[in-house]
Amino acid sequence: MRLALGLSYRGGAYRGWQSQPDGLTVQDRVEEALARFADRPVRTVCAGRTDAGVHALNQVVHLDTEIEREPFSWVRGTNRYLPPDIAVQWCRPVDAAFHARNSARGRRYAYLLLESPVRPAIEAGAVGWVFRPLDATPMREAAAHLIGEHDFSAFRSAECQAASPVKNLRRIEIVRCGAYWRFEFEASAFLHHMVRNLMGCLLAVGQGVRAPQWLAEVLAAGDRRRAAPTFAPDGLYFLGPQYDANLDLPERTPAFDWLP
């Protein structure tokens, strides 16, 4: 039997999603908790591998098991063994052909940013921070140059293992909520560090360091050295994958209502 689970987590204490020999990853903690609940080893496949310090609101994983339990038993039972900064939000039985990563038709990220003369304290680790004022108009103008199918080589990390740098960036939404900004990105898939590299560039435009057209020039050049430095991971949230509606899998969790 194949199950799909939705997870929320704070990534600050972990070295990303993917399992590592030292065990200090979200996947390691999740699989340890699942194994304790199921009383046998459990392996998971995720929709999107988040980096160190990056959070998730609706990370989706699938697993195969012979254990027959009610879906919510998997939620409550696994959460019993998880640390406070990781929680299973939902569980659904799925067809054996379902694949958390390969079945996704898109993915969404949000970056939560504080604009303030003083660094965050209560929100430390949960938001990015800038102290120089931002202007939404040039940032939105710059973002428009990125929409569509492009070679995003200028925004991938040197460690990126993606077979192709060509991705379809469908939407960038920039919203201000008081002292906070929310940048939302939707694409077919993302390259390693792509959102954080885009954030660095958009902020350079928003602070008047660069003109909006500069981002189009960086994109066309395909040279990472032409772009801004990679921005901090603190405010980056994997909102989750998007699947065909007939799968009837949740695309929201309660944590979505926490974001401004």
From Swiss-Prot:
It is an enzyme of class 5 (isomerase). Its EC number is 5.4.99.12. GO terms for biological process: tRNA pseudouridine synthesis. It comes from the Bacteria. CDD domains: PseudoU_synth_EcTruA. Keywords: Isomerase, tRNA processing. Substrate binds at Y109. InterPro entries: PsdUridine_synth_cat_dom_sf, PsdUridine_synth_TruA, PsdUridine_synth_TruA_a/b_dom, PsdUridine_synth_TruA_C, TruA/RsuA/RluB/E/F_N. GO terms for molecular function: RNA binding; tRNA pseudouridine(38-40) synthase activity. Formation of pseudouridine at positions 38, 39 and 40 in the anticodon stem and loop of transfer RNAs. Homodimer. Belongs to the tRNA pseudouridine synthase TruA family. This is tRNA pseudouridine synthase A. The lineage of its organism: Bacteria, Pseudomonadati, Pseudomonadota, Betaproteobacteria, Burkholderiales.
